[in-house]
Amino acid sequence: MPTPADDLVVIGKIVSVYGIRGEVKVYSFTDPLDNLLDYRRWTLRRDGEIRQAELVRGRLHGKVLAAKLKGLDDREEARTFTGYEICIPRSELPSLEEGEYYWHQLEGLKVIDQGRQLLGVIDHLLETGANDVMVVKPCAGSLDDRERLLPYTGQCVLSIDLAAGEMRVDWDADF
């Protein structure tokens, strides 16, 4: 039975074909990149269309993956898979240690400073090398209409309450 769309998490995207035997080139959102290959059954999603695929094999190729999907043996047929997001059910993600979070858990949280001012909501996160950065966008009731970039560090993030949908931060609202 297929997983409901709202229970899926995106772990990569098919960006083009690879070679002439029906393989696809995949951009992985996992860390490390080849963790995506641990998941054999993929739900592919593009423009509201959903289809199932089974990974036969894959390998790391520079900063992308080359993947062979079951039943996909032709370059032109593989080209029709370009643009699909690769999704898996959230329940298949490994459990994390206390105080660790997946990015999808942080997206949508309200960000509140020490003065109890609502700065906005986390729209998405960026990987910068030194530390991850949260992109906080204004929302109804937020302090102003500014987009903010906050470091996802222990110094900035004071607490996270997933049940309440809130993150408390040590951040000057003027930045």
UniProtKB/Swiss-Prot annotation:
Described purpose of this protein according to its UniProt entry: An accessory protein needed during the final step in the assembly of 30S ribosomal subunit, possibly for assembly of the head region. Essential for efficient processing of 16S rRNA. May be needed both before and after RbfA during the maturation of 16S rRNA. It has affinity for free ribosomal 30S subunits but not for 70S ribosomes.
GO cellular component: cytosol; ribosome
Domain notes: The PRC barrel domain binds ribosomal protein uS19.
Protein's recorded name: Ribosome maturation factor RimM
Cellular localization per UniProt: Cytoplasm
Domain of life: Bacteria
Protein family (similarity comment): Belongs to the RimM family.
NCBIfam families noted in UniProt: 16S_RimM (TIGR02273)
Subunit structure: Binds ribosomal protein uS19.
Domain PRC barrel residue range list: 98-175
Gene Ontology BP terms: maturation of SSU-rRNA
Keywords: Chaperone, Cytoplasm, Ribosome biogenesis, rRNA processing
InterPro entries: PRC_barrel-like_sf (IPR011033), PRC_RimM (IPR056792), RimM (IPR011961), RimM_N (IPR002676), RimM_N_sf (IPR036976), Transl_B-barrel_sf (IPR009000)
GO molecular function, one term: ribosome binding
